[in-house]
Amino acid sequence: MATVVVSVDCAAANQGRCYTPELVRVAEEFHVPMTWLITVSANDPMSNIMLYHAEYLHRIPSWHEIGLRVHFQSNGTPITDGRERGMLIQEGKDLLKQCHIKPTAFRAADHMLQVSDLRYLEDIGIVVDATVAPGVVFEGRVDWGDAPTQPYHPAYNDLKARGDAKLLLVPVATYGGQLASLDMEWDALESILDYHLRHSEVISVAARDWANGVANWQRCAQYLRERGCRFVTLSQLASEWGR
């Protein structure tokens, strides 16, 4: 029986459409939790937090989870300086705190986590990260080509090696170079799910609040429920996962 986590990138403030109410409706229909990762960026730290505070936080059930997603770019240029990234992580935590949210789950936008982030994330209380994309290479950005496919604690000097970090990394389910996302074609998503149902203990599925993955979310939830899967939040998985 696989354990499933579904995490949503929340960055709809400047996208023109937000599918959060519909995604929540499906989650309630099947009584499955989701982890909502609200995006903060250097250029626009507030828009998504303000959107969720005004429109959606009161609609998301208390048994779901609210976490943090950071976009490490400034004017289209990746931020690679460790200290600057650490300040942005701290800013994200402080902004969510103003909404009475203490995030313990995290994702780096565009899968651009770097090793210097580990200590900063641990220092603000993050226990689990959902950035890793095994087997996927983002040219000129990151290479997750030989990353582990199941949850692991990384080394402090190598994100793709198992080590002593407190932070648990939960890789997104991938197969054939594609990441499991609710807004992809159903046939492709089904292929990824089927592969991991055969081979994995944990299946991590991603979503984007500005992309219409509602129908696939309904199919996915039913499909996995019928196969005996249990659904948890990212932080719940971290609390259950042994070293």
Language model features with spans:
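Short, surface-exposed basic-aromatic patches at helix termini and helix-loop junctions that form
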Residues: 25, 57-59, 115-127, 222-226
